[in-house]
């Protein structure tokens, strides 16, 4: 995994980008200042919109022109619906800090989000578990509907409309990259052609257009990727009774992880990763059968064996003898009573990682640069982490009067984020594979590993600190 994700350096400037009809390097005849931007962000999803917001609210970008291209229409949430959306994100404290920096987090808190203060992860094939919490019961993270985040970002984009222009229902169809060396009759910027024929120029193009990124493909950047033989089923669930509901639950089943994320005292969001065939069955089940399947997945011990349970108990006793301190006790998740109508959907899962995040006048962020399995709950947080890093380097460059598209600071962003993202992708992929088998030796090793990790508080704190970024 790590070897496949290793960074492949670029040999010749945009040599690969000259393949295919969508990309060209041609001479430039000149352009109006009206269509020249300092930064163009391609893709107006959560990460792209947040990137444009962050730039628009940065003091060193007050005299810059920023453009956000979004292929879809403007999403307006005039009134918060009573029913919760089935598409939610787990927001880390680090991501909440980023959203707070430009005012979006206040909007989110004034609408609705749910903090969780503990997270319990356990194995369906043994009694092994790990409990993440904080001694002072600080928030570990927040479960927020994607529509709520998008509404908050839209509000903050409107607040900086003087700096940030948003073109909805607009999509780039081709790019012209600048020559690697300055030429008197060529443009030094990236040239973008939109679907309606309009042309734009930018000193820096930021690709935030998802895991099938057109920007990445047009630039000829290699993407290491594969599809897992899994789909994720998501749904909005009603609990059997009202609870404090501040724990995020995740259980590793042989077919894939199932997670229950708190939305309110009586509601939780389901993310169940399983085989394509089983996922299709879950979506088509009658409601009562579906609810029974969820409760069984969280409560049943059908995959346990006496040998594994005995071996796990021996290690647990040894740990308790050597370290007679408080050990996290296994808690029982809440039972599910029913599911919101029409909230069940599925989507395929996979992994992806761009060999390069940057080229001259180009940076990739979010899913355009990396795609991760949802078991870690880090997808959007990785994208927001990209924003924090890129914003830092671009803000410093703007303050010093540097060229925003220069590799001198773009490379620093790439180094920073590839180091973090590659480690997280590799760890997530390893966990997915480690928990996808019932082989006795593997189950025993992962049982002992989980128990040992749960007993070492400093190690758990390091894991939480890494995931909180």
Curated annotation (Swiss-Prot):
Enzyme class, first EC level, given as a word: oxidoreductase
InterPro entries tied to this protein: FAD-bd, FAD/NAD-bd_sf, Ubi_Hdrlase_CS, UbiH/COQ6, UbiH/COQ6_monooxygenase, UbQ_mOase_COQ6
GO MF: 2-methoxy-6-polyprenolphenol 4-hydroxylase activity; 4-hydroxy-3-all-trans-polyprenylbenzoate oxygenase activity; FAD binding; oxidoreductase activity; oxidoreductase activity, acting on paired donors, with incorporation or reduction of molecular oxygen, reduced flavin or flavoprotein as one donor, and incorporation of one atom of oxygen
Gene Ontology biological-process annotations: ubiquinone biosynthetic process
Any one of the GO CC terms: mitochondrion
Membrane topology: Peripheral membrane protein
Compartmental location: Mitochondrion inner membrane; Golgi apparatus; Cell projection
Top-level taxon of origin: Eukaryota
Keywords, comma-separated and alphabetical: Cell projection, FAD, Flavoprotein, Golgi apparatus, Membrane, Mitochondrion, Mitochondrion inner membrane, Monooxygenase, Oxidoreductase, Transit peptide, Ubiquinone biosynthesis
Subunit structure, as described in the record: Component of a multi-subunit COQ enzyme complex, composed of at least COQ3, COQ4, COQ5, COQ6, COQ7 and COQ9. Interacts with COQ8B and COQ7.
Homology family: Belongs to the UbiH/COQ6 family.
Name of protein: Ubiquinone biosynthesis monooxygenase COQ6, mitochondrial
